[in-house]
Amino acid sequence: MARIAGVDLPRGKRVDIALTYIYGVGRATALEILDTTGVDWTRNIDDLSADEVNEIRKEIEQNHKVEGDLRREISSNIKRLMDIGCHRGLRHRRGLPARGQRTKTNARTRKGPRRGVAGKRK
């Protein structure tokens, strides 16, 4: 089992699919990495030699921000927005959508489950 960027890549999967298990690597980035390293994307992870795995590992470490570094950068960007008090930062602070979506209805993913209002007493 190949281990790249602290992630165990699944056995028996194609290389381009297996690379997407790394946080920050999608299909397009995976194909770009494989194109740069010269590894055929149709091969299985099990079929790669140690040299090819090291080549992929080196490419990811040098030219791509993945896993912990990427998570840290994203959270620091959000924290910066909240600290400067801009509109997007305020929306993050309040747990509301930050990109202009409506909130009268919908937005339940961001707002969480409904909080019911007590009905009128008789």
Curated annotation (Swiss-Prot):
Molecular-function GO term, any one: rRNA binding
GO biological process: translation
Residue ranges of the region described as Disordered: 89-122
Entry keywords, A to Z: Ribonucleoprotein, Ribosomal protein, RNA-binding, rRNA-binding, tRNA-binding
SUPFAM superfamilies: S13-like H2TH domain (SSF46946)
Transferase is among the record's keywords: no
CC terms in the record's Gene Ontology section: cytosol; small ribosomal subunit
InterPro entries: Rbsml_uS13_C, Ribosomal_uS13, Ribosomal_uS13-like_H2TH, Ribosomal_uS13_bac-type
Family, as annotated: Belongs to the universal ribosomal protein uS13 family.
Quaternary organization: Part of the 30S ribosomal subunit. Forms a loose heterodimer with protein S19. Forms two bridges to the 50S subunit in the 70S ribosome.
Function: Located at the top of the head of the 30S subunit, it contacts several helices of the 16S rRNA. In the 70S ribosome it contacts the 23S rRNA (bridge B1a) and protein L5 of the 50S subunit (bridge B1b), connecting the 2 subunits; these bridges are implicated in subunit movement. Contacts the tRNAs in the A and P-sites.
Listed name of the protein: Small ribosomal subunit protein uS13
Lineage, highest ranks first: Bacteria, Pseudomonadati, Thermodesulfobacteriota, Desulfovibrionia, Desulfovibrionales
Gene field: rpsM
